[in-house]
């Protein structure tokens, strides 16, 4: 068995990636989220495939086909809710994974970090298009509002929006192409994950202390396979609890009303995992400025490796940076809350203040704190 594992070309690749992989001996549970994201992707592709067997991407029948899945297909309701709530679990794991990378300085692996940002954009695009497919009120109006943002691009904006819509409004052509992209993107994500892992295994994993761990490695199996298994069990327990007890907890009631272009919902909002970016978009009165701020709220992650001026990689021994990090986390939670509120005072003001804090913390306060810590440590 060992002979096959170490010499067969295919088994050798798996062995080097998941069995005999040298891993730091001190990585904590924060390193579990990578494998949990892999599990989420498998769940989403599997449930999505079964949903696609029954779904029809036509404006006249899309809403009815989702109802048919829930009522008439064997265990269709559980497949549908696993897919919808699986997306929420996916984003929870994504945010934790990125948060861990920021806290422990994993962003210094430039290639791995940049592929990760590409993955984040791909997952966000997939989730957005998936939200449009049930063709409820929030699906239709969410698609209309978000795609319309591209019209802020000077000179070519309007043409670009109509090209994406496949007409002069969100209609059958839009739904069909969104379904096609929603189906293909997870497989592109899976390919990007392979590249992400390839670059990660070139350098080896980071660890909580942020110092090289080449002198103290242990094999991935059995130590971290068991650890990842515990994380997977907890994830599945949370997901199934959500699906079986409160499947609509994270959804929007408006999406149980079929799409009606003649009736605008009082408050259009995306899924909860986009609310922080949506709040930043809304906090700027100018349309183009809002779109740029929306894009920068995610793209700013690509700047973090270049803004890192601390002599220590991890925040583990840097209390001032830790304080700022938790300010940033609290700020993102505030933005998420604001994104779900109506556009009126005091929510507008809170959103604007939170947006300023978000950008100034990352672009100004964190680099300055890094320099101050270097000074205090006489480095």
From Swiss-Prot:
Q: Which biological process terms from the Gene Ontology are attached to this UniProt entry?
A: mitochondrial electron transport, ubiquinol to cytochrome c
Q: Which CDD domains match?
A: cytochrome_b_C, Cytochrome_b_N
Q: Which UniProt keywords apply?
A: Electron transport, Heme, Iron, Membrane, Metal-binding, Mitochondrion, Mitochondrion inner membrane, Respiratory chain, Transmembrane, Transmembrane helix, Transport, Ubiquinone
**GO cellular component annotations, sorted alphabetically?**
mitochondrial inner membrane; respiratory chain complex III
Q: Is Repeat one of the keywords?
A: no
Q: Which GO terms describe its molecular function?
A: metal ion binding; ubiquinol-cytochrome-c reductase activity
- A Pfam family this protein belongs to? Cytochrom_B_C
Q: How does it assemble?
A: The cytochrome bc1 complex contains 11 subunits: 3 respiratory subunits (MT-CYB, CYC1 and UQCRFS1), 2 core proteins (UQCRC1 and UQCRC2) and 6 low-molecular weight proteins (UQCRH/QCR6, UQCRB/QCR7, UQCRQ/QCR8, UQCR10/QCR9, UQCR11/QCR10 and a cleavage product of UQCRFS1). This cytochrome bc1 complex then forms a dimer.
What is the role of the protein in this entry? Answer: Component of the ubiquinol-cytochrome c reductase complex (complex III or cytochrome b-c1 complex) that is part of the mitochondrial respiratory chain. The b-c1 complex mediates electron transfer from ubiquinol to cytochrome c. Contributes to the generation of a proton gradient across the mitochondrial membrane that is then used for ATP synthesis.
Put simply, this protein is called Cytochrome b
């Amino acid at each position: 068995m060992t002979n096959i594992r170490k010499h067969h070309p295919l088994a050798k690749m798996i062995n080097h990636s998941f069995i005999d992989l040298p891993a730091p001996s001190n990585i904590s549970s924060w390193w579990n989220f990578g494998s949990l994201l892999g599990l989420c992707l498998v769940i989403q592709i599997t449930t999505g495939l079964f949903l696609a067997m029954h779904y029809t991407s036509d404006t006249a029948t899309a809403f009815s086909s989702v109802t048919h899945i829930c009522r008439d297909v064997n265990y269709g309701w559980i497949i549908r809710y696993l897919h919808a709530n699986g997306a929420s679990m996916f984003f929870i794991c994504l945010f934790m994974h990125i948060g861990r990378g920021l806290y422990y300085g994993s962003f210094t692996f430039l290639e791995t970090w940049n592929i990760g940002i590409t993955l984040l954009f791909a997952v966000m695009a997939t989730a957005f298009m998936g939200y449009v497919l049930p063709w409820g009120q929030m699906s239709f109006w969410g698609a209309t509002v978000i795609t319309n943002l591209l019209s802020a691009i000077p000179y070519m904006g309007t043409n670009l929006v109509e090209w994406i819509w496949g007409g002069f409004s969100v209609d059958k052509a839009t739904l069909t192409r969104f379904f096609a992209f929603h189906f293909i993107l997870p497989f592109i994500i899976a390919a990007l994950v392979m590249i992400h892992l390839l670059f990660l295994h070139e350098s080896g994993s980071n660890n909580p202390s942020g110092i090289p761990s080449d002198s103290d490695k242990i094999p991935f199996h059995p130590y971290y396979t068991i650890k990842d298994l515990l994380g997977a069990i907890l994830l599945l327990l949370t997901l199934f609890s959500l699906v079986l007890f409160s499947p609509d907890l994270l959804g929007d009631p408006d999406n149980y009303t079929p799409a009606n272009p003649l009736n605008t919902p009082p408050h259009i909002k995306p899924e909860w995992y986009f609310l922080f970016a949506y709040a930043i978009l809304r906090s700027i009165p100018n349309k183009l400025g809002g779109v740029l701020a929306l894009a920068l709220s995610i793209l700013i992650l690509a700047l973090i490796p270049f803004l890192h001026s601390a002599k220590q990689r991890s925040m583990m021994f840097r209390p001032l940076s830790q304080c700022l990090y938790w300010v940033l986390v609290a700020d993102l939670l505030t933005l998420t809350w604001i994104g779900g509120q109506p556009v009126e005072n005091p929510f507008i003001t809170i959103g604007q203040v939170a947006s300023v804090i978000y950008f100034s913390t990352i672009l100004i306060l964190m680099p300055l704190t890094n320099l101050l810590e270097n000074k205090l440590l006489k480095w």
